């Protein structure tokens, strides 16, 4: 294990050339969910931890790229920065806007946020009174996308709140490779 964020990125994320491939640069992809001062699970990171990681990436010479830039490299051989990194956020939490976005702006680091459509701008689960961690809405998405640093993409419309998905029902297995005996 690494002792500091900088040593983690130095030790783990070194791009290495691939052999027998047209792709000559490995691109690390870092995935986050939610930033919070009170970290209560492995899907969360504090703003201080996140900033330390982004600072370490920047100091190590990494440049954030979008998935469009990665795709252009893979499909057309368009050049990438010397040390590219893709930073992603799943689900579209409001903290991506209020906490992560200012840090990404400070360091000029690009990121892609995969927002859940049905949760867009919401703080309650659909059709319920149950509170959920707030998600950013259209105004925040427009501001971030307009910055040129953030790309907003889809992370399903409603799959995260589909009852059979939540309760592990066999209905989830429809149209999926069958298991032996099915």
Regions found by a protein language model. Give the residues of each.
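Short, well-ordered alpha-helices that flank and scaffold nucleotide-derived cofactor binding pockets
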Residues: 102
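Substrate-binding cleft of extracellular glycoside hydrolase catalytic domains
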Residues: 69-70, 82, 86-94, 99, ...
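Metal-dependent polysaccharide deacetylase catalytic core of the NodB/CE4 family, i.e.
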Residues: 25, 33-40, 83-85, 105-182
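General structural signal for secondary-structure boundaries
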Residues: 5, 46, 66-67, 95, ...
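Aromatic- and glycine-enriched glycan-recognition loops and surfaces
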Residues: 44-58, 92-93, 133-143
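N-terminal pre-catalytic segment of deacetylase/amide-hydrolase enzymes
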Residues: 2-85
């Amino acid at each position: 294990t690494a002792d500091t964020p900088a040593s983690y990125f130095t030790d783990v994320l070194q791009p290495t050339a691939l052999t027998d491939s047209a792709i000559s640069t490995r691109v690390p992809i870092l995935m986050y969910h939610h930033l919070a001062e009170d970290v209560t699970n492995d899907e969360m990171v504090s703003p201080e931890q996140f900033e330390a990681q982004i600072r370490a990436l920047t100091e190590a010479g990494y440049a954030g790229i979008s998935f469009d830039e990665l795709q252009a490299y893979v499909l057309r051989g368009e050049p990438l920065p010397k040390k590219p990194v893709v930073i992603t956020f799943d689900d579209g939490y409001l903290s991506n806007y209020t906490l992560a976005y200012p840090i990404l702006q400070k360091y000029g680091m690009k990121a892609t946020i995969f927002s859940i459509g049905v949760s867009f701008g919401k703080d309650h689960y659909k059709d319920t009174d149950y509170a959920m961690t707030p998600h950013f809405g259209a105004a925040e998405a427009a501001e971030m996308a307009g910055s040129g640093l953030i790309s907003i993409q889809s992370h399903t419309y409603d799959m995260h709140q589909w009852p059979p998905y939540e309760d592990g029902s066999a209905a989830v297995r429809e149209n999926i490779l069958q298991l032996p005996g099915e």
